[in-house]
Design a protein with these regions (language model features):
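Membrane-helix boundary elements
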Residues: 12-44
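Aromatic-anchored segments of alpha-helical transmembrane domains
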Residues: 31-33, 81-89
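Membrane-water interface at the C-terminal end of transmembrane alpha helices
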Residues: 110-128
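Structural signature of hydrophobic alpha-helical transmembrane segments
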Residues: 41-54, 76, 101-109
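Cytoplasmic-side transmembrane-helix entry/capping segments in multi-pass membrane proteins
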Residues: 70-80
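Membrane-helix boundary connector in multi-pass membrane proteins
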Residues: 85-105
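Canonical alpha-helical transmembrane segments
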Residues: 52-68
Length: 128
């Protein structure tokens, strides 16, 4: 019986390709971060972050399906929850002096922490 071939998962992994990384994760972070210098309304800032998190969450969920990247199974839903929370802040349902910065910070920290299981169990949930 042959050993599992990891190159199949790696070749499908958008996070391991500069173009995929740029499109799905770097670009939306830059767009979200640009709200701090564009002097937009609070609601616009929140909805831009909601869109950025939804974009990244979609990239993670699609990547999890493509290559079974472990942290994408975790960060995809976390980013979508952040998108929903940011939209709720933008619509005024969630309020507070630091509501948006809290949502953004917590979402980004959760997405970063989703890499920890890969350090324990490996990069991919299954080997193709």
């Amino acid at each position: 019986m042959a050993a599992p071939d990891c190159t199949t998962n790696e070749s499908r992994d958008w996070a391991r390709r500069p173009g995929g990384m740029l499109f799905w994760w770097v670009l939306p972070i830059l767009i979200g971060a640009s709200t701090y210098v564009l002097n937009l309304s609070f609601a616009a800032d929140a909805f831009i972050w909601a869109g950025a998190f939804a974009w990244m969450g979609t990239g993670c969920l699609l990547n999890a399906r493509r290559c079974a990247r472990l942290h994408c199974f975790i960060s995809g839903p976390a980013l979508w929850l952040g998108a929903i929370a940011a939209a709720l802040v933008g619509s005024g349902i969630i309020s507070g002096p630091h509501a948006l910065s809290n949502v953004v910070s917590i979402t980004i920290v959760l997405a970063m922490l989703s890499c920890v299981p890969e350090m324990i169990w490996g990069r991919y949930a299954r080997q193709d």
